[in-house]
Amino acid sequence: VVILLDSITRMARAYNTVERGTGRTMSGGLDSSAMQKPKAFFGSARMIAPQHGGGSLSIIATALVETGSRMDEVIFEEFKGTGNCEIKLDRGLADRRIYPAFDIATSGTRREEKLYRPDQLDKVHLLRRGLHQLPPQAGMEWLIKRIAATSNNDSLLDGL
């Protein structure tokens, strides 16, 4: 099962508005209890053991960042580091119609060593270091061309 949530920030704001508060207000006007249900919801994503029916629950959620709202910053910081992957979108790339429009430097997967063989992981690190040396637009354009020119991840990484 996959749940798409747009956005975890708005969900937390809604709970902050409708839940009975504790009277303890965090920075940005967020009540300290407002994050309990959104955190429990987000924390429910997991692989379910075969003895309990198997399967998994994946949650793909957006979070608002750089909005100028202190509350949004507090909410984001509460969830930051709890997911397996963070993809930060890049407005500059989107404005230029370069897709996928994500910031390569700040996006990534935690525990990527579980996704790649050791030789692949070394090449992924090499790829990231090379992309970090390029401006975002040039890096994404180069990566898109390389992906289009190869048939699979091994071919892409072997070509580095």
Identify the function of each model-found stretch.
Residues 1-160:
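P-loop NTPase catalytic core
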